[in-house]
């Protein structure tokens, strides 16, 4: 059932830049909206994707894996976007997480966008394959993953997109060779829930 699309050559993992401008004032930005996670499955799925890397990462390079953290683009007039999970390689938190200027993923602090972002579909109105697809392309995220376990948006529960030029092309495989990771689905029990989970390989 693979789509017949042309898959572009892997996008090189971007390195942090060292000539970024002076960080703007973030005191007026909303970094937390106290909105609850949409459902328990989504909460557990985010845990699988973030915690697995923290306990098993063997690459020897720093990384940041987080859930429900806002990404703020460099352009001051662009609104933040909050993926369910993000993974950024070769970076470390630039400061204490309790400070407002370090609570979110400000691209001007890290020098680059995350390598991968995930959206976990819980309803048909989240815009995961429309507005969010466009936003992540605009801020130059190399890989965008939509996990739709109930097939609410598509007959394919897992779709992976790779940035090609200014837009995304859907991948026909689940591997990220330039990052050294891949994805698979697994049916089993995690923390009391028996579900079809998305996990790293």
Sequence positions of predicted segments:
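C-terminal interaction segment
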Residues: 1-38, 43, 52-55, 71-77, ...
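A short acidic/basic microdomain associated with nuclease active sites
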Residues: 59-71
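A structural signal for short, well-ordered beta-strand segments and their strand-loop junctions
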Residues: 64-66, 145-148
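Short acidic/polar active-site loop segments enriched in Thr and Asp
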Residues: 142
């Amino acid at each position: 059932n693979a789509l017949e699309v042309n898959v572009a050559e892997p996008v090189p993992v971007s390195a942090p830049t060292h000539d970024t401008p002076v960080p703007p004032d973030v005191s007026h930005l909303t970094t937390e909206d106290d909105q609850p996670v949409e459902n328990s499955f989504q909460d557990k799925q985010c845990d699988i994707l973030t915690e697995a890397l923290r306990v098993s990462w063997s690459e020897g390079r720093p990384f940041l894996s987080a859930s429900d953290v806002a990404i703020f683009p460099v352009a001051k007039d662009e609104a933040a976007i909050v993926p369910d999970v993000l993974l950024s390689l070769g970076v470390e938190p630039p400061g204490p997480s309790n400070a407002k200027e370090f609570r979110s993923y400000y691209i001007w602090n890290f020098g680059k966008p995350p390598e991968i972002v995930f959206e976990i579909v819980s309803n048909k109105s989240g815009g995961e394959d429309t507005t969010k697809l466009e936003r992540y392309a605009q801020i130059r995220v190399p890989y965008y993953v939509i996990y739709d376990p109930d097939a609410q948006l598509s007959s394919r529960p897992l779709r992976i997109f790779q940035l090609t030029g200014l837009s995304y092309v859907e991948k026909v495989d689940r591997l990220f060779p330039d990052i050294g990771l891949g994805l698979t689905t697994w049916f089993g029990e995690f923390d009391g829930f028996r579900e079809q989970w998305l996990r790293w390989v």
